[in-house]
Amino acid sequence: MKAFTQHNGLVAPLDRANVDTDQIIPKQFLKSIKRTGFGPNLFDEWRYLDVGQPYQDNSKRPLNHDFVLNNARYQGASVLLARENFGCGSSREHAPWALEEYGFCAIIAPSYADIFFNNSFKNGLLPIILAEDDVDQLFKQVEASPGYQLRIDLQAQTVTRPDGEVLSFEIDAFRKHCLLNGLDDIGLTLMDADAIASFEGKHRASQPWLFRD
């Protein structure tokens, strides 16, 4: 997993509350357990005017030009600004996969659904919680200022606006450590590879009848 330390990124405002995981990545695209291939279908039912299907050539599909990610001023956005209860609905790890593959490194919202929140950290996507008043102000500034960027400093736990205003956010110390060091569950396990190998060796020696060579 790629480490997250600091990030300067263009902000895309998704001004909708209670965005659920089926809206983030619709169910028909969940047939793969690979982590790649979901970005082109992020928010599929909002980005396109037709019904998308797996492995379809999206370049030939009609775009919904009223949707924020189809607006030229937000092309290349890497920070998603959202409303409360983002990521609600069914549990699917494909949701943070799709957001990350599209190009988002962080999300800013007043609140998240618990499962989505946890899945985001496990996949290197930083979900930042800010007060609703601060989020409201960010929406106003983003919509009024083309090219609006934020600076996110995970070590300092701050979001800095273009006007220099600094917003602080809280994050669990363990999750922060994992993101700063690029550690997912597999990476954490591999840190104890020597201890695991030592245990397996002792276990095999003490109870050889449990193993078949």
UniProtKB/Swiss-Prot annotation:
It catalyses: (2R,3S)-3-isopropylmalate = (2S)-2-isopropylmalate. Pfam families: Aconitase_C (PF00694). One of its GO terms (biological process) is L-leucine biosynthetic process. GO terms for molecular function: 3-isopropylmalate dehydratase activity. GO terms for cellular component: 3-isopropylmalate dehydratase complex. Its EC number is 4.2.1.33. Catalyzes the isomerization between 2-isopropylmalate and 3-isopropylmalate, via the formation of 2-isopropylmaleate. Belongs to the LeuD family. LeuD type 1 subfamily. Heterodimer of LeuC and LeuD. This is 3-isopropylmalate dehydratase small subunit. It comes from Pseudomonas syringae pv. tomato (strain ATCC BAA-871 / DC3000). The lineage of its organism: Bacteria, Pseudomonadati, Pseudomonadota, Gammaproteobacteria, Pseudomonadales.
